[in-house]
Amino acid sequence: MVDPKESIDIENVVASTGIGQELDLESVAMDLEGADYDPEQFPGLVYRTQDPKSAALIFRSGKIVCTGAKSTDDVHQSLRIVFDKLRDLNIQVDDDPEIVVQNIVSSADLGSSLNLNAIAIGLGLENIEYEPEQFPGLVYRLDEPDVVALLFGSGKLVVTGGKRKEDAEEAVDTIVERLSDLGLLD
């Protein structure tokens, strides 16, 4: 069997930062080429970077959320681009604002189909939500690492809530170990 950890792909990294001052988003939107700002639809200004591909949500408070990046390196690179664009508009930005990863969403494949009913019973209901009429996946809340895994009958899974790439690897290891111990993984 292929090691399921080898199948892990980061799908999205969400991080936050700030420039420590309020912004006039209407003014920034007029001067920042490619910016989208429609305060009736969303309170922040959206600025997309192409390489690496991500979206920065810039708020009046000076807080910035970066989403859509495929790695923590891409988050840092995208936000450096945003900081430089703001500096080009004569907006004061610290040399190295703190960037905090809030969430990493990863996908993986356990390599065999899963009996979600048996897993729900085997893992115990205190950490599990499984209502197939509502959602086809089984929601498994892990304590260590502190993440949520969505398991699907196909054997595919999504891990969300991680702060580091290793959180997904540890979660997959834990899931494989627990399902194997229960005899529920081929």
Curated annotation (Swiss-Prot):
Record keywords: DNA-binding, Repeat, Transcription, Transcription regulation
InterPro entries: TBP (IPR000814), TBP_archaea (IPR033711), TBP_dom_sf (IPR012295)
UniProt GO MF annotations: DNA binding; DNA-binding transcription factor activity
Keyword Repeat applies: yes
Residue ranges of the TM segments: none
Record GO biological process: DNA-templated transcription initiation
A Pfam family hit: TBP
Sequence repeats: 10-86, 101-179
NCBIfam families, sorted: PRK00394.1-2, PRK00394.1-5, PRK00394.2-2
Classification via PANTHER family: TATA-BOX BINDING PROTEIN
Family stated for the protein in its record: Belongs to the TBP family.
Function according to Swiss-Prot or TrEMBL: General factor that plays a role in the activation of archaeal genes transcribed by RNA polymerase. Binds specifically to the TATA box promoter element which lies close to the position of transcription initiation.
Name of the protein in its database record: TATA-box-binding protein
Organism encoding this protein: Haloarcula marismortui (strain ATCC 43049 / DSM 3752 / JCM 8966 / VKM B-1809) (Halobacterium marismortui)
Lineage, top ranks: Archaea, Methanobacteriati, Methanobacteriota, Stenosarchaea group, Halobacteria
